[in-house]
């Protein structure tokens, strides 16, 4: 099994801290269906911070014989998104991807990406074709649960390195640790994740931006499984921001999420948020 990608060195703790909290959108709905020929349709909609609605529809087709995947998407910002993926490109473990986004009479983006995975290596290469162009590469190597990785960004037109970062980690079945130095080694973070029992998970992350602040920002989160179909989560940051959520599988393929957040340092002010999410899959 290949190690995690560089951006996922802290995935377990990041997911615990960030996923399945529903207060950021007052309402969110997504529907996923699969046609008899294997085409997957996904429709998503949610409210945004400025009280507008963000919506998108995607169709994804996979040809297992050739390893070709085509995803076509369209959103209410009138952006047409197309992704073409080809697995086992030239050699086992290598995947190529062309990802484009076009807004009529507006912005255009095109990225050419390559992914390579083997039992102890995970390497990625991203080309932003219309900006720069800029190449970003990252590499992770692993041995006995330990991982080490690095990321490098290079502006081809100016022949300059525009970013670099490094990270290390360790993970087993019950816990994981990770430390990274990003933004040209100016932002440092450390995270841990611990599966205390089959019912309880805890995790925390500390971040220090050596340029912007002398303070260390700390977040802590926990998850408790009520039963096989529901769980609750809570997180708190040193800033006082506290979030709670409840997730319930109503029936196979139907999931309801309820969330709330409040500022523990400003309980008398109207800064609290409520939200819900409803997901359907068939």
UniProtKB/Swiss-Prot annotation:
Q: What keywords are annotated for this sequence in UniProt? A: Ion transport, Membrane, Mitochondrion, Mitochondrion outer membrane, Porin, Transmembrane, Transmembrane beta strand, Transport
**Additional observations:** Has antigenic properties. Elicits a specific immune response in systemic candidiasis human patients undergoing malignant hematological disorders.
UniProt key word Ion transport: yes
Which InterPro entries does this chain map to? Porin_dom_sf, Porin_Euk, Porin_Euk/Tom40
What family is reported? Belongs to the eukaryotic mitochondrial porin family.
What cellular-component terms does GO give this entry? extracellular vesicle; membrane; mitochondrial outer membrane; plasma membrane; pore complex
Q: What is known of its domains?
A: Consists mainly of membrane-spanning sided beta-sheets.
Q: Taxonomic lineage per UniProt?
A: Eukaryota, Fungi, Dikarya, Ascomycota, Saccharomycotina
User: Can you say what this protein is called?
Assistant: Mitochondrial outer membrane protein porin
Q: Kindly indicate whether the keyword Mitochondrion belongs to this entry.
A: yes
Record the organism.
Candida albicans (strain SC5314 / ATCC MYA-2876)
Annotated GO molecular function terms are:
porin activity; voltage-gated monoatomic anion channel activity
**Subcellular location field:** Mitochondrion outer membrane
Q: What does this protein do?
A: Forms a channel through the cell membrane that allows diffusion of small hydrophilic molecules. The channel adopts an open conformation at low or zero membrane potential and a closed conformation at potentials above 30-40 mV. The open state has a weak anion selectivity whereas the closed state is cation-selective.
């Amino acid at each position: 099994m290949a190690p995690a990608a560089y951006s996922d060195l802290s995935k377990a703790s990041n997911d615990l801290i960030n996923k399945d909290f529903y207060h950021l959108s007052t309402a969110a709905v997504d529907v996923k269906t699969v046609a008899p020929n294997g085409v997957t349709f996904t429709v998503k909609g949610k409210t945004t911070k400025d009280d507008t609605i963000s919506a998108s529809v995607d169709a994804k087709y996979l040809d297992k014989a050739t390893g070709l995947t085509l995803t076509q998407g369209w959103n209410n910002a009138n952006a047409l998104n197309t992704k073409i993926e080809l697995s086992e490109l030239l050699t086992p473990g290598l995947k190529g991807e062309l990802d484009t986004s076009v807004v009529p009479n507006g912005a255009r983006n095109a990225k050419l990406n390559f992914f390579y995975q083997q039992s102890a290596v995970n390497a990625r290469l991203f080309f932003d074709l219309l900006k720069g162009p800029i190449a970003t590469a990252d590499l992770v190597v692993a041995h006995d649960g330990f991982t080490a990785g690095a990321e490098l960004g290079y502006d081809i037109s100016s022949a300059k390195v525009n970013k670099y970062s490094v990270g290390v980690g360790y993970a087993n079945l019950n816990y994981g640790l990770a430390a990274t130095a990003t933004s040209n080694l100016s932002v440092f973070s450390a995270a841990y994740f611990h599966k205390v029992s089959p019912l309880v998970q805890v995790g925390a992350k500390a971040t220090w931006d050596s340029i912007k602040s002398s303070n260390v920002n700390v977040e802590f989160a926990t998850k408790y499984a009520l039963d096989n179909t529901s769980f609750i989560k809570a997180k708190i940051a040193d800033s006082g921001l506290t979030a709670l959520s409840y997730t319930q599988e109503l029936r196979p393929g139907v999931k309801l999420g309820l969330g709330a957040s409040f500022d523990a340092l400003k309980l008398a002010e109207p800064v609290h948020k409520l939200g819900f999410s409803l997901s359907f899959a068939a």
